[in-house]
Amino acid sequence: MIRVEFLKVFRFLTVLPIGEHPKSPREIGEQAWLGLPAVGLVSGLLAGVVAWAFAGTPVRGCLVVLTLLVLEGAQHFDGLVDVGDALMAGVISEEGATKAMRDPRVGVGGLAIGSMALLLAVASFGWIPFEVLVPIEVFSRFTVLPMAAVGEPAPASYSGRVFTEYVDADQVLLGGILSTVVSLPFSPVATLTCAVCSAVVAWTCLEAARRTIRGVNGDFLGASIWVSRVLSAVCLSSLPW
């Protein structure tokens, strides 16, 4: 039964044609502890292969970022851009923040945050060792679990409800153990660094979501993945490998 549910989680989180489309939030939420780190493992391996194949070339960082964007259908990056618009509009009012997130157009806040994230990601991924891509991707996905376990869903948010209703402390513990076990063989230093970055980002994004739209939604969850990814990559790129 876990196998079937896991495949549905994988289909929900990526563009890869694996498994059936989930028919209910329960099918996604109850296996999030397994699906999120597993998706991170696959994306990290694919990105790592690209980083290894193009090591020493000026396009390495661009191709790694492109690989990640394609794999996730750019949905997490879209969430990051929406959050950028919401944070700017949220200074005025909560209604303005919600409206900004639903607006298909990109505002100044989204453009600024999205551009900065891409620039930092391209620069960092062009420098770091290819093997640390797995810990980065695994723990960037793990960031969703503590946010969902502690946070409440934002009003009228399907994605927020998918995770917040079914993710609890046990899932956070299981997901943390799984993420650590999967990441350690690739790089103990990167595993510790990414775990710390994930915790910091989860708390920061959760507080931002509470203050902006009174809860967690899919955009903030997706944004947390990107912020954790970029922060981990920047920190690791500063180490003397």
From Swiss-Prot:
Single GO BP term: cobalamin biosynthetic process
Cystine residue pairs: none
A GO CC term attached to the entry: plasma membrane
Transmembrane segments: 34-54, 108-128, 184-206, 220-240
Cofactor: Mg(2+)
Cell compartment(s), UniProt: Cell membrane
Location, primary (coarse class): membrane
Pathway where this protein functions: Cofactor biosynthesis; adenosylcobalamin biosynthesis; adenosylcobalamin from cob(II)yrinate a,c-diamide: step 7/7
GO molecular function annotation: adenosylcobinamide-GDP ribazoletransferase activity; cobalamin 5'-phosphate synthase activity
Enzyme class: transferase
Reactions performed catalytically: alpha-ribazole + adenosylcob(III)inamide-GDP = adenosylcob(III)alamin + GMP + H(+); alpha-ribazole 5'-phosphate + adenosylcob(III)inamide-GDP = adenosylcob(III)alamin 5'-phosphate + GMP + H(+)
Topology relative to the membrane: Multi-pass membrane protein
Domain of life of the organism encoding this protein: Archaea
EC number assigned by the record: 2.7.8.26
Alphabetized UniProt keyword annotations: Cell membrane, Cobalamin biosynthesis, Magnesium, Membrane, Transferase, Transmembrane, Transmembrane helix
Entries under Pfam families matching the protein: CobS
Similarity remark: Belongs to the CobS family.
PANTHER family (UniProt xref): ADENOSYLCOBINAMIDE-GDP RIBAZOLETRANSFERASE
Function summary: Joins adenosylcobinamide-GDP and alpha-ribazole to generate adenosylcobalamin (Ado-cobalamin). Also synthesizes adenosylcobalamin 5'-phosphate from adenosylcobinamide-GDP and alpha-ribazole 5'-phosphate.
Protein name: Adenosylcobinamide-GDP ribazoletransferase
Organism this protein belongs to: Methanopyrus kandleri (strain AV19 / DSM 6324 / JCM 9639 / NBRC 100938)
